[in-house]
Amino acid sequence: MTLLDPLANALSHITNSEKVGKSEVYIKPASKLIGEVLRVMQENGYIGEFEFIDDGRAGIYRVQLLGKVNKAGAIKPRFSVKAKEYEKWEKRFLPAFEFGILVVSTSQGVMTHKEALEKGIGGRLIAYVY
């Protein structure tokens, strides 16, 4: 079976492991984008520490779970968003105002929609977490 979307697979793996009550999860294959999304999730308190393990192939991320993720998913297709449009997409993907984050890939790196709004930059929506 081929893996079509590694980011969506990683986020659903995290969500399912949280629901079962696991304390850690191994995500493979690893990529720079998955690592950046994990960093944003860690900065916002959704996951604990994570580390990259080199297995001689694409690599593996070991992620400590804190039990704070209700749902995490990739946004397909990756919509382009202007700085003024974040509220519209917040209503579409997040369950309530100021609850959860949208992960945005911008020209200045991967960040939350709140950080991008403060900086006044747009980007592409890649994931949501709440």
Swiss-Prot record:
InterPro entries reported in the protein's UniProt record: Ribosomal_uS8, Ribosomal_uS8_CS, Ribosomal_uS8_sf
Pfam families in alphabetical order: Ribosomal_S8
Entry-linked Gene3D superfamilies: 3.30.1370.30, 3.30.1490.10
A single Gene Ontology CC term: ribosome
PROSITE patterns registered for this protein in UniProt: RIBOSOMAL_S8 (PS00053)
One function term, GO molecular function aspect: rRNA binding
Record key words, sorted: Ribonucleoprotein, Ribosomal protein, RNA-binding, rRNA-binding
GO biological process: translation
Summary of the function given for this chain in its UniProt record: One of the primary rRNA binding proteins, it binds directly to 16S rRNA central domain where it helps coordinate assembly of the platform of the 30S subunit.
Self-association and partners: Part of the 30S ribosomal subunit.
UniProt xrefs under HAMAP family: Ribosomal_uS8_A
Family: Belongs to the universal ribosomal protein uS8 family.
Name used for this protein in its record: Small ribosomal subunit protein uS8
Species this chain originates from: Thermococcus sibiricus (strain DSM 12597 / MM 739)
